[in-house]
């Protein structure tokens, strides 16, 4: 801590000091609340709502409301909010992030701002990381809110739309971040207002906020449909890649480059684990060309083969079974790198999942097409107010401030932390490290001290499990393969003699309580088998011990062969230690090592922040477009009269077509009326334009607008009830907009991938994406206008026009919560195919305009 901080205190200390007077006021009301009967305490809710209606603010009633919740908690679940929990509750209401250590009762803290903000009647969402915690917290903490007369709902993956709608209409709703995000996207795909499930996004309290807003923010939420592409190409590429040999690429120094030294690639391809890239060598390119009978792999028509070969190489060289994914029930299931959990229903995008399926010889499913997508950053920024809780957020404060506009306030613990955090033990090889870990576990087990071992991969947990079996140490393994038993395994992890191996304990959400007699043995011992890429995840593992003033200890074991050191450590330092003739099993102790580990972690954290920021920069462009489309859809769903919008579309089209054919400086004798009729009449069936009575271009435009309006009025008069044509307008706008928007999302996806591959010289790819995306969006809105007008101008009264979904939803990338599939009603016509109307023109120049 610097001298300046010592004198005036840290940011957190100053902010905590500011809320102390509010907390003192809450505590002073406790005797008064204790005197109230249950009925009188419950009556406070109606009193608070009346005070809000009388123009008091939430801040005005906060002290009394928090005192009411504290008393209700004592009477319902037998828990009284500690002073530090009241501090946390005030900070959450202010829309900030509160960092509270594991075991400090964050779940109970959330009841304070949830109750207060629910009094406005606009809904409060409490966001958790999995269904188990959402259900547990809704049942447990929900007792407090229901006692006080508020309604509590929970959103679970298995629920149908009616159940979801009912839960969202409650005062307080518990749900996972994935469910909230996907429900938002699905709400913007429905075709009737009655199908909407969510209300407006008012206030979110995010538990494990760093996990939700940072770890998971590297991948956007995606709802997908089938693209119709064949899967045979993936199997062919897999057969080819199995015949290719992995090579190495010599790293060239600056002098080598100056001397034009050849990098001497070997093998058919080179994989770089650090950068997560894989490339064919010259030799490899020739083999691919021979395999597919190609003259030149680089030709544009071979782009799909290039792409699929690259995916297959990535699947074999960079994606590892039991680390990145598992195979279960003839399916490839992704493993969350941060929590070690299997993520059912989630699939890698862009064909990578299919490449892995081919590699593992399971059924290759058809590639998907993106129908709707949003990042967590943009989704959570839609809330009027948001806040978060976690045990570890300070290391990412910059990101919370820059992207979400939230600062982090560290709340002191209720009792002093007694956990001892030992220095890391570093070994030369992985084998020596594992032997040392086993000896440490055996020693602790013999004296009865419970041990929790945190591993990064499933492989590592199973390897360690085998070593413990050989030594006869009874233990339990908790990883992605067995997470059904999760809560039961964790509940026993603090008992005397318990040994538990867990893949990435981060975000498990279940406290480990110490068994009888464990305190005297030193509490729970945490052993980390290697350092994670993120310091925050390491701190979360440490935080499993020493909860609520309990004793405990933590220690990390590292080898120079660990991925972190191998890929991101200083090469010179690694070579120096490797060259030392150290006896087998001896620990390496050097202050430079600790600095190297910290530097490596900071390097990765900075890199991951860059990935998330880059994702957000691209999605910000999509978000601007998404807001426009979703706002237009909502107008239609709300039953707005779309007549004025249609008339405006007709007027714009008339102007566009006249301007396309007739220049401002042309006189009537120069007008190309034949061309004007050819493009105008198929859209708006006016009489052939002769130019009679029009002395100027503006006069011609005005006459055509008036004739088009008369035509539309005549069309409207064909329907017995005006509401019939109004509903048809809504149906057509929805159908055309959805169809074009989904194609546009896919096109934007392709554009982004293309921009990543192109070299724009000194031009920023994000700027290029924005410029080209803007042009594509304008083209899309133009095609929506043309198709809508054309359909409405040609609609007949005997036609049965109903709202329908335009694409089949096949799944999402984060879970399997998509609703029942929606069937496409008609076969999609290729833009270049002959138009089915029989005009002889291509579809895109005729009915597909």
Show which residues each predicted segment covers:
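Conserved P-loop NTPase motor core
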Residues: 1-581, 630-631, 647-648, 652
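Short Cys/His-rich zinc-binding micro-motifs
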Residues: 825-844, 848
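Short, Lys/Glu-rich amphipathic helical modules
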Residues: 448-461, 638-639, 691-694, 836
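Extended, charged helical/alpha-beta scaffold domains that provide interaction surfaces
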Residues: 325-333, 339-346, 548-549, 556, ...
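Hydrophobic, well-ordered secondary-structure elements that form the walls
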Residues: 453, 501, 741, 777, ...
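Active-site-adjacent structural elements in folded domains
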Residues: 110, 437, 820-822, 830
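Intrinsically disordered, compositionally biased charged tails
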Residues: 254-257, 471, 824-828, 846
């Amino acid at each position: 801590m610097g001298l300046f901080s010592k004198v005036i205190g840290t940011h957190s200390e100053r902010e905590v000091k500011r809320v102390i007077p509010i907390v003192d006021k809450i505590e002073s009301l406790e005797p008064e609340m204790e005197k109230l009967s249950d009925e009188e305490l419950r009556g406070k809710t109606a009193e608070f709502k009346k005070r809000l209606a009388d123009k008091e603010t939430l801040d005005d009633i906060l002290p009394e409301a928090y005192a009411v919740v504290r008393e209700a908690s004592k009477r319902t679940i037998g828990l009284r909010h500690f002073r530090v929990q009241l501090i946390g509750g005030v900070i959450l209401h202010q829309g900030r992030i509160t960092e509270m250590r594991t075991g400090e009762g964050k779940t109970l803290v959330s009841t304070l701002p949830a109750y207060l903000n629910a009094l406005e009647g606009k809904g409060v969402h409490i966001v958790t990381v999995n269904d188990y915690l959402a259900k547990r917290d809704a049942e447990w903490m929900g007792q407090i809110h229901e006692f006080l007369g508020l309604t509590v709902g929970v959103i679970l993956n298995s629920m149908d739309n009616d159940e979801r709608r009912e839960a969202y209409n409650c005062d307080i709703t518990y749900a996972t971040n994935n469910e909230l995000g996907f429900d938002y996207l699905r709400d913007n795909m429905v075709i009737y207002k009655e199908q909407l499930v969510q209300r407006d996004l008012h206030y979110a309290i995010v538990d494990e906020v760093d996990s939700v807003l940072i770890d998971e923010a590297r991948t956007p939420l995606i709802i997908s449909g089938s693209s119709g592409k064949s899967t045979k190409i993936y199997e062919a590429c897999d057969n080819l890649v199995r015949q290719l040999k992995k090579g190495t690429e010599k790293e060239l120094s600056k002098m080598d480059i100056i001397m034009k030294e050849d990098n001497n690639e070997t093998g058919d391809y080179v994989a770089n684990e650090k950068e997560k890239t894989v490339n064919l060598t010259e030799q490899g390119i020739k083999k691919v060309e021979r395999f597919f009978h190609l003259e030149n792999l680089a030709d544009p028509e071979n782009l799909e083969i290039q792409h699929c070969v690259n995916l297959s190489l990535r699947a074999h060289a960079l994606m590892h079974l039991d680390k990145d994914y598992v195979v279960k029930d003839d399916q490839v299931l992704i493993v969350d790198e941060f929590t070690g959990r299997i993520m059912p229903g989630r699939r890698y995008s862009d064909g990578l999942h299919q490449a892995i399926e081919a590699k593992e010889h399971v059924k290759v499913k058809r590639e998907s097409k993106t129908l709707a997508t949003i990042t967590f950053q943009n989704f959570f920024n839609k809330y009027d107010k948001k806040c978060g809780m976690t045990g570890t957020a300070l290391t990412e404060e910059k990101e919370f401030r820059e992207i979400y506009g939230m600062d982090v306030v560290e709340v002191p613990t209720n009792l002093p932390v007694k956990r001892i955090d030992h220095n890391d033990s570093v070994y030369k090889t992985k084998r020596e490290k594992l032997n040392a870990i086993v000896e440490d576990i055996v020693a602790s087990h013999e004296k009865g001290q419970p041990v929790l071992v945190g591993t990064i991969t499933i492989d590592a947990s199973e390897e360690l499990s085998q070593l413990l079996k050989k030594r006869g140490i009874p233990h339990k393994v908790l990883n992605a393969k067995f997470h059904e038993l999760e809560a039961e395994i964790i509940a026993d992890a603090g008992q005397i003699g318990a040994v538990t191996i867990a893949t990435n304990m981060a975000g498990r959400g279940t406290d480990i309580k110490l068994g009888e007699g464990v305190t005297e043995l030193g509490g729970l011992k945490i052993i980390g088998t290697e350092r994670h890429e993120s310091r925050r995840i390491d701190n979360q593992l440490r935080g499993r011990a020493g909860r609520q003033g309990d004793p405990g200890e933590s220690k990390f074991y590292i080898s120079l062969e660990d991925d972190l050191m191998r890929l991101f450590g200083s090469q010179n330092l690694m070579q120096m230690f490797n060259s030392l003739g150290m006896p087998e099993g001896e620990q390496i102790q050097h202050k430079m090592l600790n600095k190297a580990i910290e530097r490596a972690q900071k390097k990765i954290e900075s890199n991951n922040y860059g990935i998330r920021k880059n994702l957000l920069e691209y999605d910000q462009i999509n978000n601007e477009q998404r807001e426009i489309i979703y706002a237009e859809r909502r107008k239609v769903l709300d039953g707005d009269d779309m007549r004025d919008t249609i008339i405006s579309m007709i007027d714009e089209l008339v102007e566009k077509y006249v301007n396309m054919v007739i220049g401002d400086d042309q006189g009537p004798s120069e007008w190309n009326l034949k061309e004007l009729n050819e493009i105008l009449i198929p859209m708006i069936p006016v009489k052939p334009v002769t130019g009679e009575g029009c002395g100027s271009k503006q006069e011609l435009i005005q006459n055509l607008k008036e004739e088009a309006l008369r035509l539309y009025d005549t069309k409207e008069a064909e329907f017995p009830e005006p509401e019939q044509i109004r509903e048809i307008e809504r149906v057509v706008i929805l159908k055309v907009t959805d169809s074009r928007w989904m194609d546009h999302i896919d096109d934007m996806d392709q554009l982004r991938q293309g921009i990543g591959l192109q070299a724009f010289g000194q031009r920023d790819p994000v700027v290029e994406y924005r410029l080209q995306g803007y042009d594509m969006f304008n083209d899309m809105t133009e095609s929506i206008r043309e198709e809508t007008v054309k359909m409405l101008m040609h609609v007949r009264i005997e036609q049965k026009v109903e709202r329908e979904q335009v694409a089949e939803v096949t799944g999402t990338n984060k879970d399997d919560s998509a609703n029942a599939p929606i069937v496409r009603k008609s076969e999609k016509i290729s833009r270049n195919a002959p138009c089915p109307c029989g005009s002889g023109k291509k579809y895109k120049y005729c009915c597909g305009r």
